[in-house]
UniProtKB/Swiss-Prot annotation:
CDD domains: Terminator_NusB. One of its GO terms (molecular function) is RNA binding. InterPro entries: NusB-like_sf, NusB_fam, NusB_RsmB_TIM44. The keyword Glycoprotein does not apply. The keyword Transcription regulation applies. Involved in transcription antitermination. Required for transcription of ribosomal RNA (rRNA) genes. Binds specifically to the boxA antiterminator sequence of the ribosomal RNA (rrn) operons. Belongs to the NusB family. Keywords: RNA-binding, Transcription, Transcription antitermination, Transcription regulation. Pfam families: NusB. This is Transcription antitermination protein NusB.
Length: 141
């Protein structure tokens, strides 16, 4: 399903989906509000394709949230899923969705994008943590 979106804008689309997941989890903003993307203040605005791919990622993650959370939780070593910081949790959820349900996207691409987002938005250790958990998921997916 994701092949209908050009690959060039996918990084931007993943960041938008990550931000929507974070806002949904941290502030309880409804998916309906978030998928309208009226909260964006970007110039230039994202393309229609970027917004479409972001919606696909965000809503797909929410649709499979129970399975995704179980998968991520089972791959954590010395961590409790409910105690993860919300940035790392949003990145892991989004990327686990892609690893589990978007088989046309190579795992190395998913992990690379997640690590990049973790470097930009997470703590100093987030990118290593995200890389390790997602690598573990990719090996068993």
């Amino acid at each position: 399903m994701s092949e209908v979106f050009p690959k060039i804008g996918r990084r931007r689309a993943r960041i938008l989906a990550f931000q929507a997941l974070f806002a949904w989890d941290a502030a309880g903003i409804t998916p309906e509000t978030l998928t309208q993307f009226t909260w964006l203040r970007r110039n230039p605005p994202p393309s229609t394709q970027d917004l479409g791919f972001s919606r696909l990622l965000f809503l797909g993650t929410l649709e499979h949230l129970r399975e995704i959370d179980g998968c991520v939780s089972s791959r954590l070593e010395h961590w409790d899923f409910v105690r993860l910081n919300k940035v790392d949790k949003a990145i892991l959820r989004l990327s686990a969705y892609s690893l589990l349900f978007q088989k046309d996207i190579p795992p190395v691409v998913v992990i690379h994008e997640a690590v990049s987002i973790a470097r930009d938005f997470g703590t100093d250790d987030s990118f290593r943590f995200v890389n390790g958990v997602l690598d573990n998921i990719a090996k068993s997916a």
